[in-house]
A protein has these predicted regions:
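Transmembrane helix-loop-helix hairpins at the membrane interface
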Residues: 48-157
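Juxtamembrane helix-loop-helix connectors linking adjacent transmembrane helices
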Residues: 1-60, 75-81
Length: 157
């Protein structure tokens, strides 16, 4: 996984961020629609400028912890036994950990529903940033995550 910002490659960083935003925008709208259906409406709309800033923290922190650190640690372990599959397998495992950590309470109440909801969430909002991070750099996954959170925060979720 690349981190173009660390190398000072601003052109690739910019292109990576734009791609993450482009891929993420449609799925961000789908995310808000799914939340409206599943939660019955928004809580309270947030100031758009605040949403832009507030969305940076979860986007950067989640992607650095799960996409960069956990993926890297799992790769170190898996590369010894399955070197040809280690990159994607470790990325998939890190993505599943990140996805299912959103359903900790639901696992206690309704484990099968948590598994199903996590699977849907992984398909729509886990696999795209996994592919973006692997193919276009960590910045692309951060941008994808950021636009998801901006849309959610602005609309009150």
């Amino acid at each position: 996984m690349q981190l173009y910002t660390a190398n000072g490659n601003w052109r690739k960083t910019f292109r990576s961020v734009l791609l993450g935003l482009a891929v993420g925008l449609t799925l961000a709208l789908l995310n808000v629609l799914a939340l409206k259906i599943s939660q019955g409406g928004s809580k309270s709309w947030q100031n758009p400028v605040s949403a832009l800033v507030d969305a940076l923290q979860p986007a950067v922190v989640d992607e650095v912890i799960y996409r960069f650190a956990l993926w890297s640690l799992l790769w170190v372990v898996l590369n010894k036994t399955t070197p040809e599959k280690a990159v994607w397998l470790s990325g998939l495992l890190a993505m599943l950990v990140h996805t299912y950590q959103h359903f900790d309470d639901l696992f206690i109440q309704s484990p099968l529903i948590a598994i199903g909801m996590g699977a849907v969430m992984a398909i729509f909002w886990g696999i795209p940033p996994l592919i973006l991070a692997r193919r276009r750099g960590l910045e692309s996954a951060i941008a994808f995550h950021w636009i998801q959170d901006v849309a959610r925060f602005v609309t009150g979720f």
